[in-house]
Amino acid sequence: ANPTFGFTPLGLSSDAN
């Protein structure tokens, strides 16, 4: 849940968000 994107790419929970 920590993609390279700072936002939610596929609506998944992003740690970088």
From Swiss-Prot:
Keywords: Allergen. This is Major Gly 50 kDa allergen.
